[in-house]
């Protein structure tokens, strides 16, 4: 993903979704002047969980509507919005809550 601006930093999410409206508005810019509406961060075993959750909160405080934190080693996905955190594990089907409504994927398939 290209970089985006949060209220605090310039960040480069692992995976991000940009709505067609935002593509039309900002598509040619090298750095998005706001957070993406949907962001996924792939968490490595060396990442500090507290830092990962703080980064997700930073995105959510900067116009992002939904953040997926993907923990491949523990086979967990946390889907965070402004008012909830959902946990999906092996055997579950993770689904979007705010953006790309109707998108879902089996956790095991995503982490295969």
Question: Which residues does each PLM region occupy?
Answer:
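C-terminal interaction segment
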Residues: 1-62, 66-112
